[in-house]
Amino acid sequence: MEAILRAILDDDRPKVRKLLGADPRLATSLIETARLYQSKICHWIYVGDTALHLAAAGHRVELVQLLLTAGADPNATTNHRRSGPLHYAADGYITGPVWDPRRQVATIRCLLRAGAEINAQDKNGAAPLHRATRTRCAAAVKCLLAAGSDARLRNKSGSTPFHLAVQDTGRGGSGADVARAAQRQIIRQFLSFGLTPALKDGKGKTVLDSARSSWIRNMLSENPADPG
């Protein structure tokens, strides 16, 4: 298992292909020791993740396809967070050194074609759309909405993805110019999708109520408040 994990982190496709050819079980084996943060892919890896989780987190789309062809489960939720590979693919670190939104979208589409459940919720009730919104991955949000994500789905805190779009996520780099620009794009995407600032969370709080920044409130106030 160690060899294929190293090969995935190094994006060594010939090595991954060779290892899978020698032992196809590697496509479904579970990581048994904590890996924690992996700087090469800017993502956390946990016990119970699979090689597909690792490849999806790194948006290594060619490796994702190799693993799927070898029998990897696109809906594996064997880690403690009950997150699938699509959750990891929806995550991104847009201020990171290896950020590539096109590869992220390609990875998401690859997993969806393989049967990944687009509205699967992890143990906190977060679906891939929640994750993409929280990490300010505008291209991923657009891709997931177009593919049929439920934009009104609530996590265990009661928040819809639109509510997360107008809030400070607390994520590192969220105040950077690139993150603010992505946040603006995401808000526009939800509005264009037909959601309104009057959409309520599980506690009855609207999206407009959740917005604290004046520029966000101004964006929302320019749109109809019919909850639909």
Model feature map: region roles:
Residues 1-4, 30-51, 77-95, 121-127, ...:
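Ankyrin-repeat boundary/"N-cap" motif
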Residues 1-9, 17, 53:
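Amphipathic alpha-helical repeat scaffolds
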Residues 1-6, 114, 147, 167-228:
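Ankyrin-repeat-protein effector appendages
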Residues 15, 62-63, 103-107, 139-140, ...:
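Conserved ankyrin/ankyrin-like repeat signature
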Residues 20-26, 33-34, 65-73, 109-117, ...:
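Ankyrin repeat domain, specifically the short helix-to-loop turn at the C-terminus of the second helix
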Residues 104, 118-157:
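Eukaryotic tandem repeat interaction scaffolds
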